[in-house]
Amino acid sequence: MKKTQTWIVTCIYLQLLLFNPLVKTKGLCRNRVTDDVKDVTKLVANLPKDYKIALKYVPGMDVLPSHCWISVMVEQLSVSLTDLLDKFSNISEGLSNYSIIDKLVKIVDDLVECVEGHSSENVKKSSKSPEPRLFTPEEFFRIFNRSIDAFKDLEMVASKTSECVVSSTLSPEKDSRVSVTKPFMLPPVAASSLRNDSSSSNRKATNPIEDSSIQWAVMALPACFSLVIGFAFGAFYWKKKQPNLTRTVENIQINEEDNEISMLQEKEREFQEV
């Protein structure tokens, strides 16, 4: 009985071990983004429109897949936001500029950590080095918004086959996402994350069901595999132990019958002697 319990516990731990990839799959970078990003609207309104923020920008990030530039951009955003934080005093007000920027720095630092731990086949480097440039608050936080939004597509299988090559005809001045004339658009209620510009939103709106199906399939396969393996081991063990259990029961019954016969014979001899 003790061996049976030990084997059952072993099977349970084996299923948990095989089920572990499902838990890891759900640990997406998007979970690092908190609702603190909704304070960006207030921060942009508080900063002067002609204020310049230094940032090393990846050329062509508007045409390249997100996995080509996201690792570089989050690092550069972390540096720029940290420098911006140093320029403000630590005011105790809950929604002061310092407090908002400090929360954004923590979010970006978490994303940097997530990218560093990401598989190299999903995150690649752009062929061009980032260029130091100056951006207005609207332009800077538009890039911030797109970088935050890019983590939603980081797990896409299609991105693995995309090349990180920028056309030689592309110039930074033609980048629509950093154009001064482009309005700074944010949703009225920024709850979970900030949307990027209309082209990225339209692109994602065409396949949300397909993306969700792929993610659920990736998560379900390890779970199904672990359950099948666990049941297979359990069935094999039960089939192997069943004959032994049957023989054990038969032996116990035979021993009991032999004991009863011996007792009857003993009583019969005692009766004859009397």
Curated annotation (Swiss-Prot):
<dbReference type="GO" id="GO:0005856">
    <property type="term" value="C:cytoskeleton"/>
</dbReference>
<feature type="signal peptide">
    <location>
        <begin position="1"/>
        <end position="25"/>
    </location>
</feature>
<keyword id="KW-0963">Cytoplasm</keyword>
<feature type="glycosylation site" description="N-linked (GlcNAc...) asparagine">
    <location>
        <position position="97"/>
    </location>
</feature>
<keyword id="KW-0339">Growth factor</keyword>
<feature type="topological domain" description="Extracellular">
    <location>
        <begin position="26"/>
        <end position="215"/>
    </location>
</feature>
<keyword id="KW-0966">Cell projection</keyword>
<dbReference type="GO" id="GO:0008284">
    <property type="term" value="P:positive regulation of cell population proliferation"/>
</dbReference>
<feature type="disulfide bond">
    <location>
        <begin position="29"/>
        <end position="114"/>
    </location>
</feature>
<dbReference type="GO" id="GO:0030175">
    <property type="term" value="C:filopodium"/>
</dbReference>
<protein>
    <recommendedName>
        <fullName>Kit ligand</fullName>
    </recommendedName>
</protein>
<feature type="disulfide bond">
    <location>
        <begin position="68"/>
        <end position="164"/>
    </location>
</feature>
<feature type="glycosylation site" description="N-linked (GlcNAc...) asparagine">
    <location>
        <position position="90"/>
    </location>
</feature>
<dbReference type="GO" id="GO:0005737">
    <property type="term" value="C:cytoplasm"/>
</dbReference>
<feature type="glycosylation site" description="N-linked (GlcNAc...) asparagine">
    <location>
        <position position="196"/>
    </location>
</feature>
<feature type="topological domain" description="Cytoplasmic">
    <location>
        <begin position="239"/>
        <end position="274"/>
    </location>
</feature>
<comment type="function">
    <text>Stimulates the proliferation of mast cells. Able to augment the proliferation of both myeloid and lymphoid hematopoietic progenitors in bone marrow culture. Also mediates cell-cell adhesion. Acts synergistically with other cytokines, probably interleukins.</text>
</comment>
<keyword id="KW-0130">Cell adhesion</keyword>
<feature type="transmembrane region" description="Helical">
    <location>
        <begin position="216"/>
        <end position="238"/>
    </location>
</feature>
<keyword id="KW-0472">Membrane</keyword>
<dbReference type="GO" id="GO:0007155">
    <property type="term" value="P:cell adhesion"/>
</dbReference>
<dbReference type="GO" id="GO:0005886">
    <property type="term" value="C:plasma membrane"/>
</dbReference>
<keyword id="KW-1015">Disulfide bond</keyword>
<keyword id="KW-0964">Secreted</keyword>
<dbReference type="GO" id="GO:0005576">
    <property type="term" value="C:extracellular region"/>
</dbReference>
<dbReference type="GO" id="GO:0005125">
    <property type="term" value="F:cytokine activity"/>
</dbReference>
<keyword id="KW-0812">Transmembrane</keyword>
<dbReference type="Pfam" id="PF02404">
    <property type="entry name" value="SCF"/>
</dbReference>
<comment type="subunit">
    <text>Homodimer, non-covalently linked.</text>
</comment>
<dbReference type="GO" id="GO:0005173">
    <property type="term" value="F:stem cell factor receptor binding"/>
</dbReference>
<keyword id="KW-0732">Signal</keyword>
<keyword id="KW-1133">Transmembrane helix</keyword>
<keyword id="KW-0325">Glycoprotein</keyword>
<feature type="glycosylation site" description="N-linked (GlcNAc...) asparagine">
    <location>
        <position position="145"/>
    </location>
</feature>
<keyword id="KW-1003">Cell membrane</keyword>
<dbReference type="GO" id="GO:0030027">
    <property type="term" value="C:lamellipodium"/>
</dbReference>
<dbReference type="GO" id="GO:0008083">
    <property type="term" value="F:growth factor activity"/>
</dbReference>
<dbReference type="InterPro" id="IPR009079">
    <property type="entry name" value="4_helix_cytokine-like_core"/>
</dbReference>
<comment type="similarity">
    <text>Belongs to the SCF family.</text>
</comment>
<dbReference type="InterPro" id="IPR003452">
    <property type="entry name" value="SCF"/>
</dbReference>
<keyword id="KW-0206">Cytoskeleton</keyword>
